[in-house]
Amino acid sequence: MVCTTLYTVCVILCILLMYIILFRKMIHFLIDLSLIAFVISSCIRLSNAQFFANDMLYNGNVEGVINTTNIFNVESLCIYFPNSAVGRPGPGKSDGLINDNNYAQTLAVLFETKGFPKGSVNFNTYTKISDFINSIEMTCSYNIVIIPETLANSETIEQVAEWVLNVWKCDNMNVDIYTYEQIGKDNFWAAFGEDCDVAVCPLDTTMNGIGCTPASTETYEVLSNDTQLALIDVVDNVKHRIQLNQVTCKLRNCVKGEARLNTAIVRISNLSSFDNSLSPLNNGQKTRSFKINAKKWWKIFYTIIDYINTFIQSMTPRHRAIYPEGWMLRYA
């Protein structure tokens, strides 16, 4: 009986050994197959999720009210305007500034009459034009940027509008070491800072200057002077030496991407050449770029509130907001 039991045990052990030797690869195959099936099933469960395209890096907090029943909607409106528009509190002042410490609450209540829920409108001030490259992020469903226009800054405003109304991909530039060239019509160099004086020297295929001497910056052609923001456009596919004061100005190599459809710009102008076709009172031109002919900031905000639907209808809201590495967007 004992011998029979031992024989049986030996036979079982031999069978197991043969199974392990002959069918080990099959076991590994089955394990791998199970893992693949698990991954595929996980992907299928996520197939109804939304996918997003890169926009630009986000370094701040989201401003807005998140819809808890649909986390892919960010129902909010951000309005950016210069902090110089806010004056000192006092009744009956005629300086045209917002002389009220509670202006945000007052405007928010007026926006409620147009259908914006309480807490969904955010008022943000900026100090200088270059803030729009350096720090400001368009993180709301809808964004309206208000910029005063004068004869002195009309060129800058054109370039700010180009920057704000589009999505950009940028890299830092080291002009001390490298030469740079632009490779297409959507490739620009963005200069921003306190004082941007940018001059260039185009080079031929032998690295000699075209109309300039690379070693002598005095012979360079000036493209920007005394500006806070400039989009530098040079001849494509030609290498350039670049000269600028890197203490007061930074330069980035940028490529324009898709339109930022959730953002509109409002230019405040009282110039004699005011283009009335861009006024929201005439429904604008649906280009997300408007003009308001006014000097008083309360009048400006009242006009924006009263015609907010005209602004909103020219835009497409941003759906979805944040993940740790930066913010991404997708339009409806």
From Swiss-Prot:
One of the record's GO cellular component terms = T=13 icosahedral viral capsid
Q: Mind listing the UniProt keywords for this protein, alphabetically?
A: Calcium, Capsid protein, Disulfide bond, Glycoprotein, Host endoplasmic reticulum, Host-virus interaction, Metal-binding, Outer capsid protein, Signal, T=13 icosahedral capsid protein, Virion
Subcellular localization: Virion; Host endoplasmic reticulum lumen
Biological function = Calcium-binding protein that interacts with rotavirus cell receptors once the initial attachment by VP4 has been achieved. Rotavirus attachment and entry into the host cell probably involves multiple sequential contacts between the outer capsid proteins VP4 and VP7, and the cell receptors. Following entry into the host cell, low intracellular or intravesicular Ca(2+) concentration probably causes the calcium-stabilized VP7 trimers to dissociate from the virion. This step is probably necessary for the membrane-disrupting entry step and the release of VP4, which is locked onto the virion by VP7.
One Pfam match: VP7
InterPro entries recorded for this chain?
VP7 (IPR001963), VP7_1 (IPR042207), VP7_2 (IPR042210)
Report a single Gene Ontology molecular function.
metal ion binding
How is this protein named in the record?
Outer capsid glycoprotein VP7
Where does the signal peptide begin and end?
A: 1-49
The UniProt family comment states: Belongs to the rotavirus VP7 family.
Posttranslational mods: N-glycosylated.
Complex formation: Homotrimer; disulfide-linked. 2 Ca(2+) ions bound at each subunit interface in the trimer hold the trimer together. Interacts with the intermediate capsid protein VP6. Interacts with the outer capsid protein VP5*.
